[in-house]
C-alpha cells in the first residue's frame, strides 16, 4: 500500500481517506516492530511519505470546504486570507481611497475641472 499518488487520493471520499490513513499507520507500526530485527528497512520511508501525502490531501479538502463556507462573507479566518505583504494588507481599499470630505466635495462641485478644446 506504499507509494500512493496525491492525484489518486484527491478522487477519494473523506471516509476512504480516513480508512487508508488507518491502514498506513498500522503498516508503519508493523514495520517499526520489524525494524528491531532488521535495521535497514527502506519501506518505512515510503510508508511515512504516504501517510504525509494522505494527511496533506485531507487537510487540503478541509481547507477548501471552509473556504466555500466563508465565500462571500465579510470576514474570513486569517489563515484563509490572501497572503500579502504587511504594507499591502494595511493599504487603503479602493472605497476608502475614494472618500472625500464634505468641504472638498463642495469645492469640487463649485469649481469643477475645466475642459479645454484645442483648435487644430
UniProtKB/Swiss-Prot annotation:
HAMAP family, per the entry: Ribosomal_uL29
GO biological process: cytoplasmic translation; maturation of LSU-rRNA from tricistronic rRNA transcript (SSU-rRNA, 5.8S rRNA, LSU-rRNA)
Organismal lineage: Eukaryota, Fungi, Dikarya, Ascomycota, Saccharomycotina
Location(s) in or outside the cell: Cytoplasm
Quaternary context: Component of the large ribosomal subunit (LSU). Mature yeast ribosomes consist of a small (40S) and a large (60S) subunit. The 40S small subunit contains 1 molecule of ribosomal RNA (18S rRNA) and 33 different proteins (encoded by 57 genes). The large 60S subunit contains 3 rRNA molecules (25S, 5.8S and 5S rRNA) and 46 different proteins (encoded by 81 genes). uL29 is associated with the polypeptide exit tunnel.
InterPro entries: Ribosomal_uL29 (IPR001854), Ribosomal_uL29_CS (IPR018254), Ribosomal_uL29_euk (IPR045059), Ribosomal_uL29_sf (IPR036049)
Keyword Ribonucleoprotein: yes
Known function: Component of the ribosome, a large ribonucleoprotein complex responsible for the synthesis of proteins in the cell. The small ribosomal subunit (SSU) binds messenger RNAs (mRNAs) and translates the encoded message by selecting cognate aminoacyl-transfer RNA (tRNA) molecules. The large subunit (LSU) contains the ribosomal catalytic site termed the peptidyl transferase center (PTC), which catalyzes the formation of peptide bonds, thereby polymerizing the amino acids delivered by tRNAs into a polypeptide chain.
Organism: Saccharomyces cerevisiae (strain ATCC 204508 / S288c) (Baker's yeast)
Family of the protein in this entry: Belongs to the universal ribosomal protein uL29 family.
KW Nucleotide-binding (keyword) present: no
Pfam family for this entry, one: Ribosomal_L29
Gene this chain is encoded by: RPL35A
Protein name per the record: Large ribosomal subunit protein uL29A
Entry-annotated residues carrying Phosphoserine: 13, 50
